[in-house]
Regions:
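Non-catalytic substrate-recognition/targeting regions of SAM-dependent transferases
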Residues: 2-72, 81
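Short beta-strand element of Class I
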Residues: 95, 117, 123-131
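Mobile active-site "lid"/loop adjacent to the S-adenosyl-L-methionine
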Residues: 175-205
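C-terminal catalytic and target-recognition region of SAM-dependent MTase-like enzymes
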Residues: 169, 201, 215-278
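Conserved SAM-binding loop of SAM-dependent methyltransferases across substrates and taxa
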Residues: 102-124
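Helix-to-beta-strand junctions that scaffold the AdoMet/dcAdoMet cofactor pocket
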Residues: 114, 210-212
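Conserved class I S-adenosyl-L-methionine
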Residues: 90-101
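S-adenosyl-L-methionine
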Residues: 135-179
Length: 278
């Protein structure tokens, strides 16, 4: 019934199910993937699983069967645009994207740099993207090319984020802007204490790596971490880092990710924009 209603409402003809998240096991549900509607007829080839999508003025690709969740984190759509605008407005030229996956925030940063240059700002700039998934980084590289950006402005590191942040700090490397968009550290409230320590550690390192006046876009996608707790974690990270800063904006899921009144845990995605005091 829901599948038919979705197709009727959107006017689309195909629907692919990705009910394969680990949380289904906690609820005693079996994993299910495949075509719900519009799949191949007998003897016919399967419809394409590789898609090109448009977000703002950018083109991005995904594989609906193999990528994380839907293949691309659609809930961060508005935050990526906010980041691009921030990079352009402040003419930020040294950007670090941690847990970059397929480079959504990296594309946003490069778009902001290009817009700043076209508006008369200083050209150049480099976006460094870190992830531990080789295939994700390959797609991130492809996204840079797909959008016509200069590959000389894009660096990619197949590495552990925590170790990389510590090495940057040791080497005296600093950045104008940093994105922390890690995977889910706390799937439930039972994991909150351990997750809080992990969030605090990476935020402390990121704040130490920011240039004075630099900007941190930091996120938690853990339902077990409330927005209030996340604020406290980041504030504590700043205190431990010896960094003074301001929260200039709170971020969350895009408007097409609503939350019900009776289920506050549905606000799984929360973000803060922190500017280090100059």
């Amino acid at each position: 019934v829901l599948a038919d209603a979705l197709l009727k409402e959107t006017g689309l003809s195909k629907l692919y199910e990705r009910s394969d998240a680990n949380v289904r096991q906690l609820e005693g549900l079996e994993a299910a993937t495949g075509w719900l509607r519009g799949g191949p007829a007998a003897g016919q080839p399967e419809p394409p699983l590789e898609l090109t999508i448009h977000e703002h003025d950018w083109r991005l690709t995904l594989n609906i069967a193999e990528g994380h969740k839907t293949g691309f984190y659609l809930d961060q759509r508005d935050s990526r645009k906010r980041f691009a605008d921030c990079v352009q407005r402040l003419n930020l030229r040294k950007v670090l994207n941690c847990f970059c996956y397929t480079g959504g925030f990296s594309v946003a940063a490069l778009a902001g740099m290009r817009a700043a240059e076209q508006a008369g700002g200083q050209g150049g700039g480099v976006v460094t993207s870190i992830d531990s998934s080789g295939p994700a980084l390959e797609r991130a590289r492809a996204h840079v090319l797909l959008n016509g950006f200069n590959m000389a402005q894009a660096q990619f590191m197949d590495a552990d984020v925590n170790a990389s942040l510590r090495q940057f700090l040791k080497d005296g490397v600093r950045f104008d802007a940093i994105v922390l968009d890690p995977p889910k550290f706390a799937p439930t409230a039972a994991h909150a204490d351990r997750a809080a320590r992990a969030y605090k550690d990476i935020n402390r390192l990121a704040l130490q790596l920011l240039e004075p006046g630099g900007v941190l876009f930091t996120f938690s996608c853990s339902g077990g971490i409330s927005a209030d707790l996340f604020h406290k974690i980041v504030a504590s990270a700043g205190a431990d880092a010896g960094v003074d800063g301001y929260i200039t904006e709170r971020l969350g899921g895009a408007p097409d990710h609503p939350m019900t009144l009776e289920f506050p845990e549905g606000e799984y995605l929360k973000g803060l924009v922190v500017m280090r005091k100059a």
